[in-house]
């Protein structure tokens, strides 16, 4: 089933010069295509919309601060089972638990600065794509 997913390469990925490597891993998957890509620094309003469900949790403020600390690469990735697939390619949120060969397993350092975000469901993808690519998707 063809799906669309929002993928964000977080400020640590951009700062460490890993965007090319991560994008290359996504592009090498047969049948997946990056249909939109932007480099941008996220404002508070966008971050509040994106992470609103976590407001009030202990990690919310540090997460928003980190995500606003530098540019991110925002992408729309389309393809067969892309939501499940990109999340598998990324690996678990905790880089220590992530297997070698996954993005976080190979390059991740700490939980909050874990390089990549990918939509976790079709519903999340639809909501997130409207936030990051309004009018385009």
Curated annotation (Swiss-Prot):
GO terms for cellular component: cytoplasm. InterPro entries: NDK-like_dom (IPR034907), NDK-like_dom_sf (IPR036850), Nucleoside_diP_kinase (IPR001564), Nucleoside_diP_kinase_AS (IPR023005). Gene3D superfamilies: Nucleoside diphosphate kinase-like domain (3.30.70.141). Its cofactor is Mg(2+). It is found in: Cytoplasm. GO terms for biological process: CTP biosynthetic process; GTP biosynthetic process; purine nucleotide metabolic process; pyrimidine nucleotide metabolic process; UTP biosynthetic process. SMART domains: NDK. Its EC number is 2.7.4.6. The active site is at 117 (pros-phosphohistidine intermediate). ATP binds at residues 10, 59, 87, 93, 104, 114. Keywords: ATP-binding, Cytoplasm, Kinase, Magnesium, Metal-binding, Nucleotide metabolism, Nucleotide-binding, Phosphoprotein, Transferase. GO terms for molecular function: ATP binding; metal ion binding; nucleoside diphosphate kinase activity. It catalyses: a 2'-deoxyribonucleoside 5'-diphosphate + ATP = a 2'-deoxyribonucleoside 5'-triphosphate + ADP; a ribonucleoside 5'-diphosphate + ATP = a ribonucleoside 5'-triphosphate + ADP. It comes from the Bacteria. Major role in the synthesis of nucleoside triphosphates other than ATP. The ATP gamma phosphate is transferred to the NDP beta phosphate via a ping-pong mechanism, using a phosphorylated active-site intermediate. Homotetramer. HAMAP family: NDP_kinase. Belongs to the NDK family. NCBIfam families: PRK00668.1. This is Nucleoside diphosphate kinase. The gene is ndk.
